[in-house]
């Protein structure tokens, strides 16, 4: 029974993916993923990225956000990206494969950043979905807390933060925590985000340091 349910769910995801105009457009234009369009919509509204900036991209693979950010920050800027999964090289992006929850990986990541101060921390991290919200939501909230902790370690005063968050238990408290750390906080749901998804993006500017 559960196997049939899983198969039906997988088939629905595949159909949705191949019918998805954003996924199709990403393939046509050579973008790493449909996530490219999400950060593009956020950038159009909030202007987080500028030439010459230093940016940290957490949960970077397959590279949609890093690919987008690298075009904006240009040769005078720098993108430091990290993910558990491998990622094909992108010009202007320094990629570290590993779990930054591990001390050795975190140290290596911080070594690549320092002595620079980071202008923007981006996180598109998401846990492996088990299909059980009582398990998935705490895992997702743990990851966004880690991203916020990264801001505390590396973000320059008045820096910016954008993070994917799944609405559910812990969401309101998390937004409150972000508001305590940043001057302006907005919740974005890009058109390119699937309507049925609980994902939204918390966009925070003016880090209080």
UniProtKB/Swiss-Prot annotation:
Subcellular location: Cytoplasm
Active site: 164
Known catalytic reactions: uridine(2552) in 23S rRNA + S-adenosyl-L-methionine = 2'-O-methyluridine(2552) in 23S rRNA + S-adenosyl-L-homocysteine + H(+)
One Pfam family in the UniProt entry: FtsJ
Keyword tags: Cytoplasm, Methyltransferase, rRNA processing, S-adenosyl-L-methionine, Transferase
Keyword S-adenosyl-L-methionine applies: yes
Enzyme Commission number(s) from the entry: 2.1.1.166
GO MF terms, alphabetically ordered: rRNA (uridine-2'-O-)-methyltransferase activity
CDD domains in the record: AdoMet_MTases
Residues engaged in binding S-adenosyl-L-methionine: 63, 65, 83, 99, 124
GO cellular component: a single term: cytoplasm
UniProt cross-references to InterPro entries, sorted A to Z: RNA_methyltr_RlmE, RNA_MeTrfase_FtsJ_dom, rRNA-MeTfrase_E, SAM-dependent_MTases_sf
Enzyme class: transferase
Family that this chain belongs to: Belongs to the class I-like SAM-binding methyltransferase superfamily. RNA methyltransferase RlmE family.
Summary of the function given for this chain in its UniProt record: Specifically methylates the uridine in position 2552 of 23S rRNA at the 2'-O position of the ribose in the fully assembled 50S ribosomal subunit.
HAMAP family, sorted: RNA_methyltr_E
Name of this chain's protein: Ribosomal RNA large subunit methyltransferase E
Lineage: Bacteria, Pseudomonadati, Pseudomonadota, Gammaproteobacteria, Vibrionales
Gene giving rise to this polypeptide: rlmE
């Amino acid at each position: 029974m559960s196997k049939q349910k899983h198969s039906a769910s997988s088939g629905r995801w595949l159909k949705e993916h191949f019918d998805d105009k954003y996924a199709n457009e990403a393939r046509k234009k050579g973008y790493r993923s449909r996530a490219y369009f999400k950060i593009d919509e956020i950038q159009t509204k909030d202007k987080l990225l500028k030439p010459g900036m230093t940016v940290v991209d957490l949960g970077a693979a397959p590279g949609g956000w890093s690919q987008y950010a690298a075009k904006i920050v240009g040769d005078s800027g720098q993108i430091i990206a990290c993910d558990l999964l491998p990622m094909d090289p992108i010009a202007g992006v320094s990629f570290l494969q590993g779990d930054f929850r591990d001390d050795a990986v975190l140290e290596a990541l911080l070594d690549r950043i320092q002595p620079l101060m980071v202008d923007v921390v981006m996180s598109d991290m998401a846990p492996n979905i088990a299909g059980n919200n009582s398990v998935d939501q705490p895992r997702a909230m743990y990851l966004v807390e880690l991203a916020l902790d990264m801001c505390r370690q590396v973000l320059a005063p008045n820096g910016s933060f954008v993070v994917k968050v799944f609405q559910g238990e812990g969401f309101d408290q998390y937004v409150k925590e972000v508001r305590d750390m940043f001057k302006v906080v907005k919740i974005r749901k890009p058109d390119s985000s699937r309507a049925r998804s609980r994902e939204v993006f918390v966009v925070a500017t003016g880090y209080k340091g």
